[in-house]
Swiss-Prot record:
Quaternary structure and interacting proteins, as annotated: Homotetramer. Forms an RuvA(8)-RuvB(12)-Holliday junction (HJ) complex. HJ DNA is sandwiched between 2 RuvA tetramers; dsDNA enters through RuvA and exits via RuvB. An RuvB hexamer assembles on each DNA strand where it exits the tetramer. Each RuvB hexamer is contacted by two RuvA subunits (via domain III) on 2 adjacent RuvB subunits; this complex drives branch migration. In the full resolvosome a probable DNA-RuvA(4)-RuvB(12)-RuvC(2) complex forms which resolves the HJ.
HAMAP family: DNA_HJ_migration_RuvA
Name listed for the protein in its UniProt record: Holliday junction branch migration complex subunit RuvA
CDD domains: UBA_RuvA_C (cd14332)
Compartments (UniProt record): Cytoplasm
NCBIfam families per record: ruvA
């Protein structure tokens, strides 16, 4: 219903901010990653929002980027993950880190987030696989096009994205595509 707010930032009390839009003050919950990038009070601010209506409350959640809002929306679709927990996840790690954790299926990174236990982390990884890591993490996980080409080649050969990314970690950072594929195949053969 409310997709974006643009106005004057009146107050900053983590994780909540107050934004004045044409004389109406909106209380908006934001992840810490967005909070740290906000301007000083009194400055103009623009936030992408997600509006949640519950029986006892109507809440606005704000985000600095489209990828943050999309990650939030994917997180709240998961059983047992509400808006507060999703905000906690996005406050505990960047969208890129979350996408990388999903791509590499790293439970350990998610359990570091307050309120996320091992079972919840495993459920998150299972349900987010293919939704968040595919478009967000693939871009941030690979530093350059050569690395991306190496991973794509390995996946075309039938290796999973997790195996391909693990093999990529073992390669020198400046390796070319041809040599990188050869070295990655040797690493995967072991």
């Amino acid at each position: 219903m409310i997709g974006k707010l643009t106005g004057t930032l009146l107050e900053k009390n983590p994780p909540e901010v107050l934004v004045d839009c044409g004389g109406v003050g909106y209380e908006v919950q934001v992840p810490m990653s967005t909070f740290y990038n906000l301007p000083a009070s009194g400055a103009k601010v623009s936030l992408l929002t997600h509006f949640v209506v519950r029986e006892d409350a109507q809440l606005l959640y704000g985000f600095g980027t489209h990828s943050e809002r999309q990650a939030f929306r994917e997180l709240i679709k998961i059983t047992g993950i509400g808006p507060r927990m999703a905000l906690s996840v996005l406050s505990g790690m960047s969208v890129e880190d979350l996408a990388q954790a999903v791509t590499l299926q790293e439970v350990g990174r998610l359990v570091k987030v307050p309120g996320i236990g091992k079972k919840t982390a495993e459920r998150l990884l299972l349900e987010l696989k293919g939704k968040i890591g595919a478009d967000t993490g693939a871009q941030s996980l690979f530093v350059n096009n050569d690395q991306n080409d190496i991973v794509q080649a390995l996946m075309a050969l039938g290796y999973s994205d997790k195996d391909a990314a693990a093999a990529l970690k073992k390669l020198p950072p400046d390796v070319g595509v041809t040599e990188g594929i050869k070295l990655a195949l040797k690493a995967l053969a072991k």
